[in-house]
Amino acid sequence: MKKLLILAAAVFALGTSTVSADNDRPISVSELPEKAQQFIRQHFPNEKVSFAKMERELFDTTYEVIFTSSSKVEFLKNGDWKEVDCKYSTVPAAIIPQQIAQYVSQYYPDTSVVQIDRDKRDYEVKLTNGLELTYDLKFNLIDIDD
């Protein structure tokens, strides 16, 4: 009886994990939140969208847009940007908070930002020299990782 209960619990756990594992759905750019569409028009006007998708998690929805240049932008449910990753180019200057841009130009003048992420705790910035800088929400540098 005990083995049967364990087996039933394992089957249930496996079933629920596979149900929520892959909830990605391709979408058109027009299905993105208006704020995200405006962000793309403003900061990536010459980029062509390769594809866009909506990712549903248990309690959250995010959007991802990948351009033909391999640059990528992730958006939150409300259309705010979460991550900008410009693999083969630099992140548009208007996206980078002024305090972070000033720090990078002062201490790393020969580099540029290729990726920036933000969440509820911090900003993470990746430079062309491979360094990753982490800032708190008040733009104080809190970590440097190579």
Map each language-model feature to its residues.
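Bacterial Sec-dependent N-terminal signal peptides
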Residues: 1-24, 40
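Interaction-mediating elements
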Residues: 22-146
